[in-house]
Each structure stands twice: as structure tokens, then as C-alpha cells.
Amino acid sequence: MLFRLLSPLSPLALTALLLFLLSPGEVSGLLLRPLPAPCLLLFLPFQILSNLLFLLFLPLFFSLPLLLSPSLPITMRFPARWRFPPWRAPSQPAAAFLF
């Protein structure tokens, strides 16, 4: 239950949550802004890309305390698919024991 509560949100869910928290006037203001100056048009793709990357990595910051907490055993912090590379997968009884 704790893992479901602390599981990271997808960037799409975070965006929807932000739009839900904004008032309708703020949302329409975001959508109906005038076009920026031509010198800023070169900067705009980089800003959009950085915003998308921020939204992509934002869930990682929510899960970092959970992943790095020493109180949880390593089998709960890191699933077996993260601990074993595919070419060195453990035998089936060992894999069943780890879960």
C-alpha cells in the first residue's frame, strides 16, 4: 500500500494535475498568449525540451527517498530485474526466492 501511495506519477498525470489546480482564467491565459519576439523563437524549442525533460525526470525525485532508504531490505528497494542483467539472470528457484 505504501508503494502505491509513493509511486511516481507520470508526467502526463502531473500536467493534468497542474491544469486542474489552475483557475480557468490562468489556463486560457497560458493558451492565448501573444507570440514572442522573433529572437525568442530560437530559444523556445530549447525551453520546451527542458520543460519536457523536467516533467520526465520529476517522478524520479519522488521515488528517490524510497529507493535510498536503508530501512527497507534490498529486495524491496530494487526489484530483481534491476539487480540482475538479462544475460546473467539467476536460476529459477533463486528468482522465486527473491520475490
UniProtKB/Swiss-Prot annotation:
Membrane topology annotation: Multi-pass membrane protein
Post-translational modification: Ubiquitinated; a fraction of P12I is degraded via the ubiquitin system.
Transmembrane segments: 12-32, 48-68
GO cellular component: host cell endoplasmic reticulum membrane; host cell Golgi apparatus; membrane
InterPro entries recorded: p12I
UniProt keyword Transmembrane helix, yes or no: yes
GO molecular function, one term: SH3 domain binding
Domain of life from the UniProt record: Viruses
Keywords assigned: Evasion of host immunity by viral interleukin-like protein, Host endoplasmic reticulum, Host Golgi apparatus, Host membrane, Host-virus interaction, Inhibition of host adaptive immune response by virus, Inhibition of host MHC class I molecule presentation by virus, Membrane, SH3-binding, Transmembrane, Transmembrane helix, Ubl conjugation, Viral immunoevasion
Keyword Ribonucleoprotein attributed: no
Subcellular location, record wording: Host endoplasmic reticulum membrane; Host Golgi apparatus, Host cis-Golgi network membrane
UniProt main location, coarse: host cell
Motif (SH3-binding): 4-11, 33-38, 70-77, 88-93
Functional note: p12I is a modulator of T-lymphocyte proliferation and immune function and may contribute to establish a persistent infection. Binds and down-modulates cell surface expression of interleukin-2 receptors IL2RB and IL2RG. Also down-modulates cell surface MHC-I molecules by binding to free immature MHC-I heavy chains in the ER and targeting them to the proteasome for degradation. Binding to IL2RB mediates recruitment of JAK1 and JAK3. As a result of this interaction, p12I increases DNA-binding and transcriptional activity of STAT5.
Quaternary context: p12I is a homodimer. Interacts with human CANX, CALR, ATP6V0C, IL2RB, IL2RG. Binds to MHC-I heavy chains HLA-A2, HLA-B7 and HLA-Cw4.
Note: HTLV-1 lineages are divided in four clades, A (Cosmopolitan), B (Central African group), C (Melanesian group) and D (New Central African group).
Family: Belongs to the HTLV-1 accessory protein p12I family.
Protein name: Accessory protein p12I
Annotated source species: Human T-cell leukemia virus 1 (isolate Caribbea HS-35 subtype A)
